[in-house]
Regions:
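Conserved helix-loop functional segments at active or binding sites
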Residues: 83, 145, 170-173, 177, ...
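Early transmembrane hairpin module of multi-pass membrane proteins
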Residues: 28-39, 49-68, 92
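Hydrophobic, membrane-facing alpha-helical anchors
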Residues: 40-56, 100-117, 162-174
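Juxtamembrane helix-loop boundaries in multi-pass membrane proteins
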Residues: 1-20, 52-79, 97, 113-141, ...
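Structural signature of hydrophobic alpha-helical transmembrane segments
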Residues: 29-41, 90-105, 150-165
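A generic, well-ordered mixed alpha/beta core segment in the N-terminal half of proteins
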Residues: 79-115
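Helix-coil boundary and interhelical linker segments in multi-pass alpha-helical membrane proteins
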Residues: 22-29, 81-92, 141-153, 202
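N-terminal signal-anchor module of multipass membrane proteins
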Residues: 1-49
Length: 202
């Protein structure tokens, strides 16, 4: 059980990547689905069995700002489930998709309250903030799987609107305050990822 207890929440980014690769390399989608599903259940087990440490980790800025990758992963995960066993799988898949959206919207609200409206510090701004504010566009990318493109457009609009202020804020932070801890430097690669997400929606 130590494996579950010590499981870093940052693994949710890996889960998102695995599910995404399954959509790109369709001939290996089953393999990616199985690996990603196992990791999802490990994260859920940590939430259930080690709830206090789980929530304590999320009480910090960096883990919370990156945890949106879990809600995004759930949205992609739901698209794998939908075709499996009709019609039950469709209902379950839609439920997971909605849960993913609710989790992500909750992250936006909590993160904004804790780190934007209160305790704001420009040096605590990282590219991972885009996971919080632009990650909701994953709902737009996956909405067509449920014939809900009209609702997906709303989530795309939310992400697109939030893109501009976060672009200015994040860019200003990196240009003006160049001192960044080594462990937080890799977040800069998120620049490419989330503009790609917006392009995929258009």
């Amino acid at each position: 059980m130590n494996i579950i207890k010590n499981l870093p929440l940052a693994i949710t980014g890996l889960i998102l990547a695995i599910f995404s690769l399954g959509k790109i390399f369709t001939e290996f989608s089953s393999i990616f689905f199985i690996i990603g599903t196992v990791l999802v259940f490990l994260v859920l087990l940590k939430f259930i069995l080690h709830h206090d440490s789980f929530m304590n980790e999320l009480s910090n800025l960096i883990p919370l700002s990156t945890f949106g990758t879990f809600s995004m992963a759930l949205m992609i995960f739901s698209t794998y489930l939908k075709p499996m066993f009709m019609p039950i799988s469709q209902t379950i898949a839609l439920g997971i998709w909605i849960i993913g959206i609710i989790i992500h919207l909750s992250i936006i609200l909590i993160f904004t309250k804790d780190y934007v409206l209160n305790n704001f510090d420009i040096e605590n701004v990282f590219a991972s903030w885009w996971i919080v504010y632009i990650g909701i566009t994953m709902a737009a990318i996956t909405a067509p799987a449920f014939d809900l493109s009209q609702y997906g457009f709303i989530f795309f609009g939310i992400g697109f609107i939030l893109m501009t202020p976060t672009l200015i804020l994040v860019s200003y932070r990196y240009l003006k305050f160049t001192s960044i801890e080594d462990k937080n430097k890799p977040f800069i690669c998120i620049y490419a990822q989330f503009y790609q997400s917006l392009l995929l929606d258009t």
